[in-house]
């Protein structure tokens, strides 16, 4: 039931004070004026509280249970982050206030930028992008600006591996590049010979995730970087999987020129359901002049915004990023420290490999090498034997109170699950997950229809996902309309 269906004429939740603002007689154009009052639901405060409390109880979250969503790093978000981000000094300021009264916020963002540069091995960084894909687009615009500044107008191609995130080719295309797909080698990694075939004087950039989306570290990354640079192209780092290498190595040390980070993954800020996220973009020195405006600078112990950058790609959004998310990431990094962040990477890899070995006794691992933070498993054999698909297993997991792993991605593996346990899960949780998974496989063999018709315990069972995607209903339809 929606909030509109609870509406009853005359019910009120809050009485607004009388309007004492003088009418200055602004003459707005007719096309900007509302023709009729908004159709707001008329409900009591108790109705509202019960409605949204019940909806919240139906949600699944990291605070509820295991959330092994591959390539998403659904780690626990420490509550100290929330506590400090809610301090009045952060929540009651506005971006339009003069810098004299926002020095604390500016200092926090400046220091966060410096810390992220150190963690990633970059020379400069912007915190403005609102999400990972927004960071990707920003990085691609920087790559384009770099080549155009050199008069290198032929470079219109972006190489993207076939195992890459779907946002990689989308971001490259939005920036005006032609996307060229690079086929993975038999081991799931970049094949240097195959890469050489695609590199020429029309290639602007190669986009990579390392570890890649199969959870495998690109062992030839130094050679890859040298090869890309030899041909005059740039190397771009998708930071989705940075969690695995924290404190061990840095994208900048591998030879990457541009990197975007996902604060809502690696640095424990909440994510899911569309945001808010944060996708800072770091660059090496030769690309710093192209970073978007404004940039945060420090002059004589005063923090301020600098808009005077003649070769900048310009504005990429209003104001300066999702500030409250930046506060949470700052708190996380300060709390963990260098040793703590290194331990994060170690435990993420340890948990993933422990779970990989356990799951390998239930279904095949697509690439059986030691993984980093995640791995890809396939139930293709079970599907051929019983007709039970990865989607069915994912739905059945919901009945056992576990969020399904990422399914059918990467696209180069059939009937697959991409599983990322993160560093914050205990051995007990991982053992319980494998017990449940094993039980579902037994169910699939003994009673396939049971699994094919799951879930049974969720408020909504199987959605018509195709219709929801192609014909979304984004507003309430009143009967008289």
Swiss-Prot record:
It is an enzyme of class 1 (oxidoreductase). Pfam families: GcvP2_C (PF21478), GDC-P (PF02347). Its cofactor is pyridoxal 5'-phosphate. The modification N6-(pyridoxal phosphate)lysine is found at residue 265. SUPFAM superfamilies: PLP-dependent transferases. The keyword Isomerase does not apply. The keyword Oxidoreductase applies. GO terms for biological process: glycine decarboxylation via glycine cleavage system. GO terms for cellular component: cytosol; glycine cleavage complex. Its EC number is 1.4.4.2. GO terms for molecular function: glycine binding; glycine dehydrogenase (decarboxylating) activity; pyridoxal phosphate binding. Signal peptide: none annotated. It catalyses: N(6)-[(R)-lipoyl]-L-lysyl-[glycine-cleavage complex H protein] + glycine + H(+) = N(6)-[(R)-S(8)-aminomethyldihydrolipoyl]-L-lysyl-[glycine-cleavage complex H protein] + CO2. Keywords: Oxidoreductase, Pyridoxal phosphate. The glycine cleavage system is composed of four proteins: P, T, L and H. In this organism, the P 'protein' is a heterodimer of two subunits. Belongs to the GcvP family. C-terminal subunit subfamily. This is Probable glycine dehydrogenase (decarboxylating) subunit 2. It comes from Thermosipho melanesiensis (strain DSM 12029 / CIP 104789 / BI429). The lineage of its organism: Bacteria, Thermotogati, Thermotogota, Thermotogae, Thermotogales. The gene is gcvPB.
């Amino acid at each position: 039931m929606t909030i509109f269906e609870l509406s009853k004429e005359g019910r009120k939740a809050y009485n607004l004070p009388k309007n004492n603002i003088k009418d200055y007689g602004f003459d707005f154009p007719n096309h900007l004026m509302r023709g009729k009052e908004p159709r707001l639901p008329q409900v009591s405060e108790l109705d509202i509280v019960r409605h949204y409390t019940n909806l919240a109880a139906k949600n699944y979250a990291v605070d509820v249970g295991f959330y092994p969503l591959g390539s998403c790093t659904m780690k626990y978000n420490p509550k100290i982050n929330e506590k400090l981000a809610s301090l009045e000094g952060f929540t009651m300021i506005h971006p339009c206030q003069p810098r004299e009264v926002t020095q604390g916020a500016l200092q926090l963002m400046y220091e966060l930028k410096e810390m992220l540069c150190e963690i990633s091995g970059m020379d400069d960084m912007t915190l403005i992008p609102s999400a990972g894909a927004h960071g990707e687009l920003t990085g691609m615009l920087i790559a384009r600006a770099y080549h155009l500044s050199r008069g290198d107008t032929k470079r219109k191609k972006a190489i993207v591996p076939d195992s890459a995130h779907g946002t990689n080719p989308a971001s490259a295309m939005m920036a005006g590049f032609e996307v060229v797909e690079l086929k993975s080698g038999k081991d799931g990694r970049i094949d240097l010979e195959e890469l050489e075939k695609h590199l020429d004087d029309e290639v602007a950039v190669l986009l990579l995730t390392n570890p890649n989306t199969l959870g495998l570290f690109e062992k030839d990354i130094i050679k890859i970087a040298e090869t890309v640079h030899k041909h005059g192209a740039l190397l771009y780092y998708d930071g989705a999987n940075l969690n695995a290498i924290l404190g061990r190595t840095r994208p900048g040390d591998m030879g990457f020129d541009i990197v975007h980070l996902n604060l809502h993954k690696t640095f424990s800020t909440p994510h899911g359901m569309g945001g808010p996220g944060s996708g800072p973009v770091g660059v090496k020195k030769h690309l710093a002049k192209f970073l978007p405006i404004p940039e945060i600078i420090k002059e004589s112990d005063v923090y301020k915004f600098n808009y005077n950058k003649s070769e900048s790609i310009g504005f990429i959004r209003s104001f300066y990023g999702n500030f409250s998310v930046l506060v949470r990431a700052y708190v996380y990094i300060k709390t963990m420290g260098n040793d703590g962040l290194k331990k994060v990477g170690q435990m993420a890899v340890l948990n993933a490999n422990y779970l990989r070995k356990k799951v390998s006794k239930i279904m095949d691992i697509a690439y059986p090498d030691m993984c980093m933070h995640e791995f890809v498993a396939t139930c293709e054999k079970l599907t051929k034997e019983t007709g039970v698909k990865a989607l069915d297993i994912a739905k059945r997991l919901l009945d056992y109170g576990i969020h399904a792993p990422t399914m059918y991605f990467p696209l180069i593996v059939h009937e697959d699950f991409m599983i990322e346990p993160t560093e914050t899960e205990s051995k007990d949780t991982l053992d319980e997950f494998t017990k449940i998974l094993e039980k579902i496989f037994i169910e699939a063999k003994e009673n396939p229809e049971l699994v094919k018709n799951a879930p049974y315990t969720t408020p909504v069972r199987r959605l018509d996902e195709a219709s929801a995607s192609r014909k979304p209903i984004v507003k309430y339809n009143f009967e008289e309309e």
